[in-house]
């Protein structure tokens, strides 16, 4: 945890506290087993993020985590070229840098800084305006996204932010509320980036219920009925 020196400004102390309050949450499991993230559907990760952009990484630099001279923690500062912003307009117009913990045990993200590869980046906006990204955010090479995922970034995912996506690990698995969608990729395919993650969004209907909407090519197999064992 960083310490604010007697010569630090209130702004620097506030920025450091905001940053390390987030880091403290990651450091608890990291101290034992490294970075650990709960499984989440891409839609849920985008709904939880304050910022969603498409960007290239121009360069990277290791920088101090705060202006506090007593703080020895480091961050990686990625200089980016923003291509498109999908979420976060009301807080930032253009993003020049994103920051991530230097240590992978604190969920730091390693990106290719060659100004060629494009990424979908999601993250948080700190009180000092810095954009923070980590492994528990949804960060993917743009070319790895399905056509349905790319189209869903504009509006479809955000239309379902009032829905709840529940991960199914075993049967029986059933909804407990009308605004719930069951995510079965892990149960059926033993992977998180399965058909539902790549081709489906959980959308709220006019009657308040939520259901899966297929925005891309149909999957190779239909989902099985897992409401009963």
Provide a role label for each language-model segment.
Residues 2-229:
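Transition segments tied to proteolytic processing and entry into folded domains
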């Amino acid at each position: 945890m960083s310490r604010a020196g007697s010569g630090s400004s209130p702004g620097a102390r506030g920025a450091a506290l905001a940053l390390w309050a987030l880091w403290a949450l990651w450091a608890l499991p990291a101290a034992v087993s490294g970075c650990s993230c709960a499984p989440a559907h891409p839609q849920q990760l985008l709904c939880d993020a304050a910022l969603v952009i498409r960007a290239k990484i121009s360069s990277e630099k290791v920088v101090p985590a705060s202006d506090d001279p007593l703080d020895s923690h480091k961050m990686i500062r990625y200089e980016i070229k923003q291509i498109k912003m999908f979420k976060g307009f009301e807080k930032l117009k253009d993003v020049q840098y994103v920051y991530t913990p230097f240590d992978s045990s604190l969920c730091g993200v390693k990106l290719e800084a060659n100004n060629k590869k494009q990424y979908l980046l999601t993250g948080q906006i700190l009180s000092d305006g810095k954009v923070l990204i980590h492994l528990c955010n949804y960060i993917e090479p743009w070319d790895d996204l399905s056509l349905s995922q790319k189209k869903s970034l504009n509006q479809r995912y955000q239309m379902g932010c009032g829905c709840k996506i529940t991960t199914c690990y075993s049967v029986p698995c059933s909804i407990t509320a009308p605004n719930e969608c069951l995510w079965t990729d892990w149960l059926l395919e033993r992977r998180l980036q399965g058909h539902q993650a790549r081709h489906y969004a959980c959308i709220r209907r006019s009657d308040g219920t939520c259901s899966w909407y297929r925005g891309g090519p149909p999957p190779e197999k239909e989902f099985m009925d897992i409401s009963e064992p």
